[in-house]
Amino acid sequence: MIEKKVVSQLIEEKLASSSNYLVDVVIKPGNLIVVEIDNDEAVSIDDCAELSRYLEEHLDRDVEDYELEVGSAGITSPFKVLRQYVKNIGNEVEMLLKNGSKLTGVLKSADENGVVVSVEKKVKPEGAKRKVTVVEDESYTFDEIKYTKYLIRFK
């Protein structure tokens, strides 16, 4: 079986000279290698084709046969690496926390410790008859987050 570590290392070597970065490598039964890459701007089909050719040059089909899929991380795919969070600062995201609660808000910041999201909440001030909307910044560590993904809104 082809090792994920070997494939990841080859990809990192190839992408080191570009603005693309590795999001994930999955090796499925039957040696199906699925590679996801991303970019702070956009990943082109040429980027995917170039990486695919590079991997085919460096992995020997005579030793072990495999099937290869190289693609970009989809816009609705959950974020898997910190750089995807940083790329989406200022965008609206949907988060599912491990405690089961789901929230939407604007991603304010992200670093190796976690993320800060601005969330709108309805709060009833003391003595008021109606609830008012307030925006609060909430911090979460990556251990608390099950997934985060870009929120697409059609208006």
Curated annotation (Swiss-Prot):
Subcellular location per UniProt equals: Cytoplasm
Q: Which chain positions lie within coiled-coil regions?
A: none
Q: Which GO terms describe its cellular component?
A: cytosol
Entry's SUPFAM superfamilies? YhbC-like, N-terminal domain
- Which keywords are on file for this protein? Cytoplasm, Ribosome biogenesis
Which Pfam family, just one, is annotated for this protein? DUF150_C
HAMAP family on file: RimP (MF_01077)
The name of this protein is Ribosome maturation factor RimP
Organism whose genome encodes this protein: Parabacteroides distasonis (strain ATCC 8503 / DSM 20701 / CIP 104284 / JCM 5825 / NCTC 11152)
